[in-house]
C-alpha cells in the first residue's frame, strides 16, 4: 500500500459508495459534526477530505465496502444488508441499522407466469440475480429447485429475453418491474443500510470512533 494511501494512526477512514447511500449518510455525518468537502459525483477523487482533518472518506463500489472494512483499508463503512448477506461478516462488527436506503429483496416473474403453481408442481426454475448466495439459501429453505444465473445488472431483462423464469433483485417502488411487465411474487427480506466497523479498529481507535458511532445511532434512531 503506497504512502499516499496510508492514513496516519489517528486518522479514521470511512468507506462509502456513490449514490443513494452516500447522500443519505451525509445527515448522519453532519450529526457527528462532519461535512464531506467534495462531491463524489463531480470529483474524480476517490479519497475525499472532510471538515474534520482526522476523518476521510474513500469512494468504493457498494459491493466492496465490506472488503475494505474487513481488511482494515477502512475503519468503518456503510453497506446495505443485501451486500452484507452476500459478503458475510468475517472481521466485521455491525452495531447499527442506520435506517437509510430502505428497500426489499424480492422474487419477480413475468406477469401471467403462475409462480405459485410452478413451485407447487416442483418445477425447476431459472433465476437471474446478483445475490446468488442469498437466493440459494432462500430457495433451499422453501424446497424450490432453481438454477441460479449470475448477472451484474439489468435483472429485468432476463425473463424478457428467455434467459430466466424469474429474478431476485432489490425493489423500492416497483416502477422498474412494472415498466418491464414483471410482478413481485415473494419478498425475501427487508433491506436497509448498516454501519460496519473493522473489529481491530473498534479496539485500537475506540476513543475516536465512539463519538461518531453514538451520533450515527442517535440520528438513525430518529429515522426509524
From Swiss-Prot:
Signal peptide positions on this chain: none
EC assignment: 2.4.2.17
Name of a matching Pfam family: HisG
GO BP term, pick one: L-histidine biosynthetic process
Database matches in InterPro entries: ATP_PRibTrfase_cat (IPR013820), ATP_PRibTrfase_CS (IPR018198), ATP_PRibTrfase_HisG (IPR001348), ATP_PRibTrfase_HisG_short (IPR024893)
Top enzyme class: transferase
Gene Ontology terms, MF aspect: ATP binding; ATP phosphoribosyltransferase activity
Pathway annotation from the record: Amino-acid biosynthesis; L-histidine biosynthesis; L-histidine from 5-phospho-alpha-D-ribose 1-diphosphate: step 1/9
Keywords: Amino-acid biosynthesis, ATP-binding, Cytoplasm, Glycosyltransferase, Histidine biosynthesis, Nucleotide-binding, Transferase
Main location: cytoplasm
Tree of life domain: Bacteria
GO annotations of cellular component type: cytoplasm
Reaction equation(s) it catalyzes: 1-(5-phospho-beta-D-ribosyl)-ATP + diphosphate = 5-phospho-alpha-D-ribose 1-diphosphate + ATP
Localisation: Cytoplasm
Subunit structure: Heteromultimer composed of HisG and HisZ subunits.
Record remark: domains: Lacks the C-terminal regulatory region which is replaced by HisZ.
Functional description taken from the UniProt entry: Catalyzes the condensation of ATP and 5-phosphoribose 1-diphosphate to form N'-(5'-phosphoribosyl)-ATP (PR-ATP). Has a crucial role in the pathway because the rate of histidine biosynthesis seems to be controlled primarily by regulation of HisG enzymatic activity.
UniProt family annotation: Belongs to the ATP phosphoribosyltransferase family. Short subfamily.
Name recorded for this polypeptide: ATP phosphoribosyltransferase
Native source species: Cupriavidus metallidurans (strain ATCC 43123 / DSM 2839 / NBRC 102507 / CH34) (Ralstonia metallidurans)
Name of the coding gene: hisG
Amino acid at each position: 500500500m503506497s504512502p499516499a494511501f496510508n492514513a496516519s494512526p489517528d486518522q479514521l477512514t470511512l468507506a462509502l459508495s456513490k449514490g443513494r447511500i452516500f447522500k443519505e449518510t451525509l445527515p448522519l455525518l453532519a450529526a457527528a459534526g462532519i461535512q464531506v468537502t467534495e462531491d463524489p459525483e463531480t470529483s474524480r477523487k476517490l479519497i475525499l477530505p472532510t471538515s474534520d482533518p482526522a476523518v476521510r472518506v474513500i469512494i468504493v463500489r457498494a459491493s466492496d465496502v465490506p472488503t475494505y472494512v474487513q481488511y482494515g483499508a477502512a475503519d468503518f463503512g456503510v453497506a446495505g444488508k443485501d451486500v452484507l448477506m452476500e459478503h458475510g461478516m468475517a472481521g466485521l462488527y455491525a452495531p447499527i441499522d442506520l435506517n437509510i436506503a430502505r428497500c426489499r429483496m424480492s422474487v419477480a416473474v413475468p406477469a401471467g407466469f403462475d409462480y405459485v403453481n410452478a413451485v407447487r408442481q416442483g418445477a425447476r426454475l431459472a433465476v437471474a440475480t446478483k445475490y446468488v448466495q442469498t437466493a440459494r439459501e432462500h430457495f433451499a429453505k422453501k424446497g424450490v429447485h432453481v438454477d441460479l444465473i449470475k448477472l451484474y445488472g439489468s435483472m429485468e431483462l432476463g425473463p424478457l429475453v428467455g434467459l430466466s423464469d424469474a429474478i431476485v433483485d432489490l425493489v423500492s417502488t416497483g416502477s422498474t418491474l412494472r415498466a418491464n411487465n414483471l410482478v413481485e411474487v415473494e419478498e425475501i427480506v427487508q433491506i436497509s443500510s448498516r454501519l460496519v466497523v473493522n473489529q481491530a479498529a473498534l479496539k485500537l481507535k475506540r476513543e475516536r470512533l465512539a463519538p461518531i458511532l453514538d451520533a450515527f445511532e442517535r440520528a438513525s434512531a430518529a429515522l426509524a
